[in-house]
């Protein structure tokens, strides 16, 4: 059996906790990834797709009206402008090319908000791969536009009714399917979590977010930002933003987890600050679990952050104090969803609205000139029906009071 080429751990987090049957498939994936990273032809094709199909580089936009403090400039890294509507497209193109390189004909994926599913469906349509997407039945309901998009592009969408019928259950089903079909199928994992080598692959295929940001902010401001801020579910958009800044000690890295109905309630999805280390989804990582070690249901108004664990590199960055992790509630995210639309003409994804909410809160307290960059990880078209229903219900409640 070949040895691993890359370190499967970030400090104490990560690893490859999978059934023995999947170990060869993961080792094959790692080996193909390492080779591809050193192959100029692979890199050229990936770069070409990012530029001419996905639309990179994305803009770095200085907000005109969002900052509550004249001392603070808030920039948005516009992953919402990427083809497919979110940062997900970046690494999906990378993994789909990798799958073709390994001779795989089928792609299996899981999705929460549907953005990863859409990105996977478009990459499969483009590259001629068969596509199967597992999605929690609850998410199928709350993300109908994305379900239709996936089907339109030829993907088979499989609703998962087990457990809480959300993202973690979709992950389990996708992993189960892959265990039975890894000889012909590639599991295209959607976040920087799961068993090694996925957290490393996803980070490397998302790191252009931070690389572009660094170049763009130096051009615009002549210096690095004081902080980069991103929402964290599994953590792929955040690690994509953080990766190129980890070795820049002057830049604070801030991840924003979903506080849901409040951190003091069971209705949240913030395992980094409020979970215990456990084994889940093939990795060792902070996990929302009860006293008996059973996985607790996570909760967030945003389907893409509704995940009971988090990527191992985020857990490590938190443990060593290199990044700090805050949280924003449903109400704060909903308020910011509307505020950005009204004051900048940009409708953010509910996920990204969590990061924006914390950035604005942080800006209020600044006492010196400060530059903040928020990763606007996706656009909010997928969320307009959810938000419209919530606002209508709130209006009705206040009318009944």
UniProtKB/Swiss-Prot annotation:
Gene3D superfamilies: 3.40.50.1100. Its EC number is 4.2.1.20. InterPro entries: Trp_synth_b_CS (IPR006653), Trp_synth_beta (IPR006654), Trp_synth_beta/beta-like (IPR023026), TrpB-like_PALP (IPR001926), TrpB-like_PALP_sf (IPR036052). Pathway: Amino-acid biosynthesis; L-tryptophan biosynthesis; L-tryptophan from chorismate: step 5/5. It catalyses: (1S,2R)-1-C-(indol-3-yl)glycerol 3-phosphate + L-serine = D-glyceraldehyde 3-phosphate + L-tryptophan + H2O. Its cofactor is pyridoxal 5'-phosphate. SUPFAM superfamilies: Tryptophan synthase beta subunit-like PLP-dependent enzymes (SSF53686). Pfam families: PALP. It is an enzyme of class 4 (lyase). GO terms for cellular component: cytoplasm. Keywords: Amino-acid biosynthesis, Aromatic amino acid biosynthesis, Lyase, Pyridoxal phosphate, Tryptophan biosynthesis. Transmembrane segments: none annotated. The modification N6-(pyridoxal phosphate)lysine is found at residue 88. GO terms for molecular function: tryptophan synthase activity. Tetramer of two alpha and two beta chains. Belongs to the TrpB family. The beta subunit is responsible for the synthesis of L-tryptophan from indole and L-serine. This is Tryptophan synthase beta chain. It comes from Shewanella denitrificans (strain OS217 / ATCC BAA-1090 / DSM 15013).
